Amino acid sequence: MSEDEAQFHGNYDDYVTYLKRRIRQLELQVRMLEADKERLERELSRLRSEMSRLRQPPAFAGSVIEVLDDDRAIVQNYNGPRFVVRIAPWIDKSKLRPGTRVALDQRTMAIIEILPASKDPAVLGFEVVERPNVTYNDIGGLKKQLQELREAIELPLKHPELFEEVGIDPPKGVLLYGPPGCGKTLMAKAIAHEVNATFIRVVGSELVRKYIGEGARLVHELFELAKEKAPTIIFIDEIDAIGAKRLDETTGGEREVNRTLMQLLAEMDGFDPRGNVKVIAATNRPDILDPALLRPGRFDRLIEVPLPDFEGRLEILKVHTRRMKLRGVDLRLIAELTEGASGADLKAIATEAGMFAIRERRTYVTQEDFLKAIDKVLGNEKKIIQQIMSHEVIYG
C-alpha cells in the first residue's frame, strides 16, 4: 500500500477527490511544459534563421542603368564595368528605374534587393525635428507677420481645397528678412508645429562646398529628404550665403556658390506648389540677394520681421515672464526702457533678471533685477558697438 493510500485508508471518497485534484495539477503542469516547449522551438527556429542569414555571403552594391525585357537589366557596379543581369522574381520591377540602387548577388550578379537612395551624411546631419514644440503662444509682437506666414504656408498644407476653389496656386516659398534675433526661426518652427510637419533647418553656409558639384548635390538630396518626410517645411537660415547676386567676374569658389544657387532655383521650380514641401528662408541682408530668387514662382511672399515696437516688446516680455514669479515689476516700464531691443535681447534680459534673483537667494524677481539686467544686456551691447566704431576710426 502506498503512502497516499495509507493516508486515506478507509476513506475512499476523500482519496478519489485527492486523486482528481492531483490529476488536474499534473495536467496543468503538462500544458505549461508544452507551452514552454513551443516557445523554445520558436526561439530555436528564429536563431537558426538568424544564423542562416548571417552566413549568407555579402552582396555587391550597384545602380540600374537600364531595365530590359525578359526580366533583365543593365547594372553597373560602383567604379566597375556594366553587366546584363537577371532580376529576381520577388523584385517589384515597377520600382526599378535608371539610377536605382540595388544589391547584386555575389556569384550571379542578379538583382536580389532594392536599396534605399543614398544620401550624403551632411544631409542626414541637418537638424530634422519631427514636430517642433514651439507654438504661436511662444511668439509675441508679430501678429501681422504670423498671419501672412500662415496664409502662405499653413493654409496650403491644411486646406489646399481653398486654393483650388479660387483657382490660384499658393506661394512656393516665403522669405523672412529683418534684423537678427527678431523671431524668424521661431515663426518657422511654430508653423511646422501647427501643421504637424517635419522641420528641416539648414544654414546657408552648410550648402557651400569645396569641390565642384558637391553643393548642388546637397541641395538636391535635401529636397529628396524633404519629399520622403512630407509634409515638410525646409527652413534655410542665412540664405544670403548662397543667394547673393551673381557677378560677371568670379573666382572658383564663387562659381561653385553660383552652381549651388542655380540648383536651388531648379529645385524650387521643379516641385508642385500644392505639394507637401514648403520652403521658408531668412536673411539679414535682403539687399544683396539675387533677383532670380525673389521673382514670382520661387519666394513669392516677402515678409519683413522688424524690431518690435512698444506693444510688441510688451507682448514678448509677457511671453518670457509668464512662468516667473514677479513682485512689483512694471512690464510697461521695462518695455519703455528697452527701445531698440530685439526679441532675443528681451529674452536675455528676462533670463539675466532671474539670475540676479538666484544670486540673492530669492525665488521671485523684482523690478531692480530687471533694471540691472537691462543695463547688463543692452549696456554691454552699446559699449561693444562703441569700441568697434572707435577701432575702425583709429585703424581705418
UniProtKB/Swiss-Prot annotation:
Pfam families: AAA, AAA_lid_3, Prot_ATP_ID_OB_C. Its main location: cytoplasm. It is found in: Cytoplasm. The keyword Cell cycle does not apply. One of its GO terms (cellular component) is proteasome-activating nucleotidase complex. One of its GO terms (biological process) is protein unfolding. Consists of three main regions, an N-terminal coiled-coil domain that may assist in substrate recognition, an interdomain involved in PAN hexamerization, and a C-terminal ATPase domain of the AAA type. ATPase which is responsible for recognizing, binding, unfolding and translocation of substrate proteins into the archaeal 20S proteasome core particle. Is essential for opening the gate of the 20S proteasome via an interaction with its C-terminus, thereby allowing substrate entry and access to the site of proteolysis. Thus, the C-termini of the proteasomal ATPase function like a 'key in a lock' to induce gate opening and therefore regulate proteolysis. Belongs to the AAA ATPase family. This is Proteasome-activating nucleotidase. It comes from Pyrococcus furiosus (strain ATCC 43587 / DSM 3638 / JCM 8422 / Vc1).
